[in-house]
Design a protein with these regions (language model features):
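AAA+ P-loop NTPase domains with strong preference for DNA replication initiators
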Residues: 22, 164-283
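Short amphipathic alpha-helix in the helical subdomain of ABC transporter nucleotide-binding domains
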Residues: 72, 79, 159, 163-166, ...
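The catalytic "switch" region of P-loop NTPases
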Residues: 142-176
Length: 283
């Protein structure tokens, strides 16, 4: 199944091959060069490369690692069984083991996350923890303080370079898969979903079933803008808001939440932003 999915088939196994701003890449490369990974909390939107980087670090250094999806296994039983059992045993290679917890912001903040804090101290000699999350506000502060926190957030000046790098990578993948493509259409797909690299590849693979990536798919590529939603909310026009939700209900909800989250500083008073973040975190 993994080989069938392009996101897995073409997943980078080295930090040098990951599409990241240079400042992030140099930080992760320094871990590889030292062959030592600290506890990490990688934060950012879906598909921005957090899990890819975590796995590439382990692959390149040669660490044994365990993958856990926090959204599927969020309860304390996961800690008592998988996490604690794995962290307490010695690596077959003699080096440190790594536990990668994907979507750690879904771990129970009242039971599993506090237990994680104790485990990070108890097994520090034997095991490193790498957590990824979409919203760092959902991670308790004691875990923040025990990790190097790295936010996968692109600066304005980095966006064109990263988009071009992924455009090049997507072109190489389509060529390798022998899928004919129109470069202008590919650019539209990248533009719509950037910086969600995973979504771009999944969409390209879905569109490729027709045999090619050309103007025939453009009707499906139209981007979702939240400007109309924001205007409706400001005007308290709840009829228009319900209409917007009905028209865009098929979109990925996490992606929509992320768009709203990223726009807060542009559309809200600064004093209201903390309450909005807490409200979004509930969903």
């Amino acid at each position: 199944m993994e080989d069938f999915l392009w996101v897995e088939k073409y997943r980078p196994h080295k930090i040098a091959d990951c599409i990241l701003p240079e400042e992030y890449k140099s930080t992760f490369q320094s871990y590889v060069d030292r062959k030592e990974i600290p506890h990490l909390l990688l934060c950012g939107g879906p598909g921005t490369g957090k899990t890819t980087v975590a796995r590439a670090l382990c692959d390149e250094i040669g660490c044994d690692y365990l993958m856990i999806n926090g959204s599927d296994e969020s309860g304390i039983d996961t800690f008592r069984t998988k996490i604690k059992n794995y962290a307490s045993t010695i690596s077959m290679t003699g080096g440190k083991k790594v536990i990668i917890i994907d979507e750690a912001d879904y771990l129970n903040p009242n039971s599993t996350q506090p237990a994680m804090r104790a485990a990070m101290e108890e097994f520090a000699h034997n095991c490193t923890f790498i957590m990824t999350c979409n919203y760092k506000s959902r991670i308790i502060e004691p875990l923040h303080s025990r990790c190097a926190v790295i936010e996968f957030k692109l600066r304005k000046e980095d966006k064109p370079k990263m988009a071009m790098a992924f455009m090049k990578r997507a072109s190489e993948i389509l060529t390798a898969e022998k899928v004919p493509f129109d470069r202008s259409v590919l650019a539209e797909v990248v533009k719509k979903h950037f910086p969600d690299y995973r979504r771009v590849l999944n969409e390209l693979q879905r569109y490729s079933v027709s045999g090619k990536i050309d103007t025939g798919i453009l009707a499906s590529v139209a981007d979702v803008s939240i400007n109309e939603l924001v205007s409706s909310l400001k005007e308290q026009n709840f009829s228009a808001m319900r209409k917007w939700v009905a028209e865009n209900g098929s979109e990925d909800p996490v992606r929509l939440y992320r768009k709203i989250y990223d726009s807060l500083y542009d559309v809200m008073d600064k004093s209201s932003i903390p309450n909005a973040v807490v409200l979004l975190a509930k969903y």
